[in-house]
């Protein structure tokens, strides 16, 4: 039985010594296709972006740059905001890890919500929606951290060691029960 070798998946010491004797492995970061030409890459990216914009403009007959409908197979109509489902204009959800803020805290002192125009592709010049005004993201995260340190479901323990579920068993119980 002394000839039998049981492997645990790792190489034997002899193989490890032989591997170290070889020249050291090169870095895993390799330049497979030569140096990057950043100007050419930027030009290609711009061309691809323009091609995608033109394809979308042809497909939907809508000028997404100027937010204007174009002539084509679709007939665009302006719609009142109240006739749309809420999910088209409500503010995005907070991240999953964020605490829930009571409604009273997100309102100003008079208890009213402020109308804030949307930015980017969601906004038209006349669109304003009732949303809570956002400040700097660092301020929001600091505020959430302060709010999250409130009531806990289970108090934090001062012990550095985790509690063992079997801690109340004595040695007699352990030897009798097994």
UniProtKB/Swiss-Prot annotation:
<comment type="subunit">
    <text>Forms a ternary complex composed of CCNE1, CDK2 and CDKN1B. Interacts directly with CCNE1; the interaction is inhibited by CDK2-dependent phosphorylation. Interacts with COPS5, subunit of the COP9 signalosome complex; the interaction leads to CDKN1B degradation. Interacts with NUP50; the interaction leads to nuclear import and degradation of phosphorylated CDKN1B. Interacts with CCND1 and SNX6.</text>
</comment>
<dbReference type="GO" id="GO:0004861">
    <property type="term" value="F:cyclin-dependent protein serine/threonine kinase inhibitor activity"/>
</dbReference>
<feature type="modified residue" description="Phosphoserine; by UHMK1">
    <location>
        <position position="10"/>
    </location>
</feature>
<feature type="short sequence motif" description="Nuclear localization signal">
    <location>
        <begin position="153"/>
        <end position="169"/>
    </location>
</feature>
<dbReference type="GO" id="GO:0005768">
    <property type="term" value="C:endosome"/>
</dbReference>
<feature type="modified residue" description="Phosphothreonine">
    <location>
        <position position="170"/>
    </location>
</feature>
<keyword id="KW-0832">Ubl conjugation</keyword>
<feature type="region of interest" description="Disordered">
    <location>
        <begin position="1"/>
        <end position="31"/>
    </location>
</feature>
<feature type="compositionally biased region" description="Basic and acidic residues">
    <location>
        <begin position="126"/>
        <end position="137"/>
    </location>
</feature>
<dbReference type="GO" id="GO:0005634">
    <property type="term" value="C:nucleus"/>
</dbReference>
<keyword id="KW-0597">Phosphoprotein</keyword>
<dbReference type="GO" id="GO:0008285">
    <property type="term" value="P:negative regulation of cell population proliferation"/>
</dbReference>
<feature type="modified residue" description="Phosphotyrosine; by ABL, LYN, SRC and JAK2">
    <location>
        <position position="88"/>
    </location>
</feature>
<keyword id="KW-0539">Nucleus</keyword>
<feature type="modified residue" description="Phosphotyrosine; by SRC">
    <location>
        <position position="74"/>
    </location>
</feature>
<dbReference type="GO" id="GO:0000082">
    <property type="term" value="P:G1/S transition of mitotic cell cycle"/>
</dbReference>
<comment type="function">
    <text>Important regulator of cell cycle progression. Inhibits the kinase activity of CDK2 bound to cyclin A, but has little inhibitory activity on CDK2 bound to SPDYA. Involved in G1 arrest. Potent inhibitor of cyclin E- and cyclin A-CDK2 complexes. Forms a complex with cyclin type D-CDK4 complexes and is involved in the assembly, stability, and modulation of CCND1-CDK4 complex activation. Acts either as an inhibitor or an activator of cyclin type D-CDK4 complexes depending on its phosphorylation state and/or stoichometry.</text>
</comment>
<dbReference type="GO" id="GO:0045736">
    <property type="term" value="P:negative regulation of cyclin-dependent protein serine/threonine kinase activity"/>
</dbReference>
<feature type="modified residue" description="Phosphotyrosine">
    <location>
        <position position="89"/>
    </location>
</feature>
<keyword id="KW-0131">Cell cycle</keyword>
<feature type="region of interest" description="Disordered">
    <location>
        <begin position="87"/>
        <end position="178"/>
    </location>
</feature>
<feature type="compositionally biased region" description="Polar residues">
    <location>
        <begin position="1"/>
        <end position="11"/>
    </location>
</feature>
<dbReference type="InterPro" id="IPR003175">
    <property type="entry name" value="CDI_dom"/>
</dbReference>
<feature type="compositionally biased region" description="Polar residues">
    <location>
        <begin position="104"/>
        <end position="113"/>
    </location>
</feature>
<protein>
    <recommendedName>
        <fullName>Cyclin-dependent kinase inhibitor 1B</fullName>
    </recommendedName>
</protein>
<feature type="region of interest" description="Interaction with CDK2">
    <location>
        <begin position="51"/>
        <end position="91"/>
    </location>
</feature>
<dbReference type="Pfam" id="PF02234">
    <property type="entry name" value="CDI"/>
</dbReference>
<feature type="modified residue" description="Phosphothreonine; by CaMK1, PKB/AKT1, RPS6KA1, RPS6KA3 and PIM1">
    <location>
        <position position="157"/>
    </location>
</feature>
<keyword id="KW-0967">Endosome</keyword>
<dbReference type="GO" id="GO:0051087">
    <property type="term" value="F:protein-folding chaperone binding"/>
</dbReference>
<dbReference type="GO" id="GO:0045930">
    <property type="term" value="P:negative regulation of mitotic cell cycle"/>
</dbReference>
<keyword id="KW-0963">Cytoplasm</keyword>
<comment type="similarity">
    <text>Belongs to the CDI family.</text>
</comment>
<dbReference type="InterPro" id="IPR044898">
    <property type="entry name" value="CDI_dom_sf"/>
</dbReference>
<keyword id="KW-0649">Protein kinase inhibitor</keyword>
């Amino acid at each position: 039985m002394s000839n039998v070798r049981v492997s645990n998946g790792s190489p034997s010491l002899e193989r490890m010594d032989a591997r170290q004797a070889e020249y050291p492995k090169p870095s895993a970061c390799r330049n497979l296709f030569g140096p990057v030409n950043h100007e050419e890459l930027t030009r290609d990216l711009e061309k691809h972006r323009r091609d995608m914009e033109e394809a979308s403009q042809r497909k939907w007959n809508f000028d997404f740059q100027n937010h204007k409908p174009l002539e084509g197979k679709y007939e665009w109509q302006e719609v009142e905001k109240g006739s749309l489902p809420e999910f088209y204009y409500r503010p995005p959800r907070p991240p999953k890890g964020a605490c829930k803020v009571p409604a009273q805290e997100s309102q100003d002192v008079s208890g009213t919500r402020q109308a804030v125009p949307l930015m980017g592709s969601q906004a038209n010049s006349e669109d304003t929606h009732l949303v809570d005004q956002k400040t700097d993201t660092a301020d929001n995260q600091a505020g959430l951290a302060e709010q999250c340190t409130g009531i806990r479901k289970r108090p934090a323990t001062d012990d550095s060691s985790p509690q063992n579920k079997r801690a109340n068993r004595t040695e007699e119980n352990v030897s009798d029960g097994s």
